[in-house]
């Protein structure tokens, strides 16, 4: 089962419901820097197959840390221009099918 990390937004529960329907797993993080995200991101990025960042709903520090670990662990990093969870999930699934 594929695992997609979605960073940014506030729609974690919706994403989990959508992921069940599409036979994949979603890890969600709101993208806010709660005093440090390096430790959290390191562990979840190791577990995922692709990362989708919702650009309009994710802080710069979180984006920079995600880029760093995506490169380090060779995990594809995608940027969704909108805020919608459905769009982020579909983008991740499309990338995984193409790979």
Curated annotation (Swiss-Prot):
Record-linked InterPro entries: UCP020408 (IPR016772)
Keywords: Plasmid
The organism's place on the tree of life at top rank: Bacteria
Pfam families hit by this protein: DUF2325
Family: Belongs to the UPF0751 family.
UniProt-recorded name of the protein: UPF0751 protein pXO1-84/BXA0114/GBAA_pXO1_0114
């Amino acid at each position: 089962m594929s695992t997609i990390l979605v960073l940014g937004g506030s729609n974690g529960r919706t994403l989990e419901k959508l992921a069940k329907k599409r036979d994949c797993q979603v890890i969600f993080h709101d993208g806010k820097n709660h005093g440090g995200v390096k430790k959290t991101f390191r562990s979840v990025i190791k577990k995922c197959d692709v990362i989708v960042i919702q650009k309009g709903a994710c802080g710069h520090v979180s984006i920079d840390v995600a880029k760093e670990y995506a490169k380090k662990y060779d995990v594809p990093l995608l940027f969704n221009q909108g805020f919608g969870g459905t769009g982020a999930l579909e983008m991740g699934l499309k990338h995984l099918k193409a790979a």
